[in-house]
């Protein structure tokens, strides 16, 4: 089945449209061709989420489109990178996929967590496995370069898959939900749910004393290359604006494995990763068990002797000819255009979003800096609705687990662009770091700490104002 997808250039004039033709084979979509078309249609400036990286699309493929500003050669590399993103990794030797997975892992491919390039989902209850969620582990104190200290037997992430008959999985996690109600000022009742993590069938004994756990759903990949292109100076300017508004937003300071220096964090729920390359190679290593130049050793704590005894799938299981197109793919991902930006209700919701203080952290506009890896991403005006800073979100959202300078109550401001297409892309609208919020209203009501005043402003709004604010969020 062939499906054309249309992408929009920066100035809103669709003079060169890139159509990505996707071929579905065995239930998986692969990019098969790229075509150039001509059109004189226009899109209003208010709909341009990301300048020349904006695309006009409202389907399940909305998060997987190339930026229209790419060259023909870059589009070819994007196509190869998309195939790499879909690639299934297997334990060597096998004829069923690419060698290198494991010995322990949490999946077989990037799409296991980022289905259609979108967000993960939390399981409905303890009987359902964690398909696009994982559990972080650490013990009190700081590790190397100030990173969290891993559990000595299980590392910093529970690995739920091993090699049948050879390497046991580390254990399994179950999520239990408890529900409670919140009353809004006009009498409407909203049900919220709180997760509890249960770790079962631990293969290497009990967890270390003082163990800290945190459930994490995979974030969407919308515009990650543009966020990578935002300069440190722009992030520090965001922190200055935050202080001027009486907020305490601040950047995380983390270890840059690629450049071997301290750097500002920008990726991850606690902004604990400084750049997109490190984010990708870390995910390959920790989630799929795939080694690389930066992670040459298998992910096997010392007690896991069967894991350490497994032969590798190659010298580096993630070689540059495979990694480079995947990295280009991530850097060049486009951002869907806003929808209904001119609608009166949406515009009123935008005003309420600002007047209630939501934009104190969810800043609408950033500008990218010089970006050598993909020059087309340089000096773009973008509207991700994030400041890329850490904020104290209150005790109700605290996970009890610090990460570099991020405390237990601190979370990075999540980008909101593409939010309104989440249900279309992934079939759910689960939000926050562990997917506890099932829609935008629930997510807002979980906000505390620095966001408490904004939450209370929302709680006091009449229903029609709350609906307008949510309509604005759905337009992003």
Regions found by a protein language model. Name each.
Residues 16-17, 467:
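Hydrophobic alpha-helical segments, especially transmembrane helices
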Residues 5, 20-23, 298, 305:
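Secreted/extracellular small peptides and ectodomain modules produced from precursors
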Residues 18-32:
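Bacterial N-terminal signal peptides
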């Amino acid at each position: 089945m062939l499906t054309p997808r249309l992408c929009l250039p920066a100035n809103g004039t669709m003079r060169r449209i890139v159509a990505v033709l996707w071929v579905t084979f065995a239930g998986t979509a692969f990019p098969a061709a790229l075509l150039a078309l001509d059109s004189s249609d226009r899109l209003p400036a208010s709909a341009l989420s990301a300048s020349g990286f904006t695309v006009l699309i409202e389907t399940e493929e909305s998060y997987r489109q190339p930026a229209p500003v790419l060259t023909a050669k870059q589009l070819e590399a994007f196509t190869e990178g998309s195939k790499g993103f879909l690639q299934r990794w297997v334990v060597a030797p096998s004829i069923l996929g690419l060698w290198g997975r494991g010995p322990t892992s949490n999946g077989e491919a990037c799409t296991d967590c980022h289905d259609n390039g979108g967000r993960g989902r939390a399981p409905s209850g303890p009987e359902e496995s964690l398909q696009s969620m994982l559990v972080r582990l650490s013990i009190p104190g700081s590790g190397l370069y100030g990173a969290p200290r891993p559990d000595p037997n299980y590392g910093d992430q529970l690995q739920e898959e091993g090699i049948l008959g050879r390497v046991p999985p580390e254990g399994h996690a179950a999520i239990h939900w408890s529900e409670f109600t919140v009353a809004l000022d006009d009498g409407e009742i909203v049900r919220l749910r709180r997760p509890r993590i249960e770790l079962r069938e631990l293969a290497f004994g009990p967890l270390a004393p003082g163990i800290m756990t945190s459930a994490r759903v995979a974030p969407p990949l919308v515009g990650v290359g543009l966020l990578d292109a935002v300069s440190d100076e722009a992030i520090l300017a965001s922190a200055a604006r935050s202080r001027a508004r009486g907020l305490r937003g601040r950047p995380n300071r983390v270890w840059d494995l690629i450049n071997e220096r301290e750097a500002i964090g920008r990726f991850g729920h606690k902004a604990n990763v400084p750049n997109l390359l490190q984010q990708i190679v870390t995910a390959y290593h920790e989630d799929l068990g795939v080694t690389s130049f930066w992670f040459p050793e298998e992910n096997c704590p010392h007690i896991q002797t069967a894991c350490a005894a497994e032969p590798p799938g190659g010298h580096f299981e993630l070689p540059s000819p495979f990694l480079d197109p995947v990295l280009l793919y991530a850097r060049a991902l486009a951002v869907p255009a806003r929808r209904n930006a001119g609608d009166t209700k949406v515009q009123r919701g935008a005003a309420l979003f600002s007047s209630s203080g939501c934009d104190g952290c969810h800043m609408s506009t950033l500008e990218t800096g010089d970006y050598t890896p993909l020059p087309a991403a340089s000096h773009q005006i973008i509207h991700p609705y994030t400041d890329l800073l850490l904020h104290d979100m209150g005790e109700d959202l605290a996970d009890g687990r610090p990460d570099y300078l991020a405390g237990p109550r601190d979370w990075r401001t999540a980008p909101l662009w593409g939010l309104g297409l989440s249900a279309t892309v992934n079939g759910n609208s689960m939000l926050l770091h562990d997917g506890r919020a099932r829609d935008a209203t629930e997510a807002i009501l979980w906000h505390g700490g620095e966001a408490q005043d904004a939450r209370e402003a929302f709680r006091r709004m009449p229903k029609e104002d709350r609906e307008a604010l949510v309509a604005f969020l759905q337009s992003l």
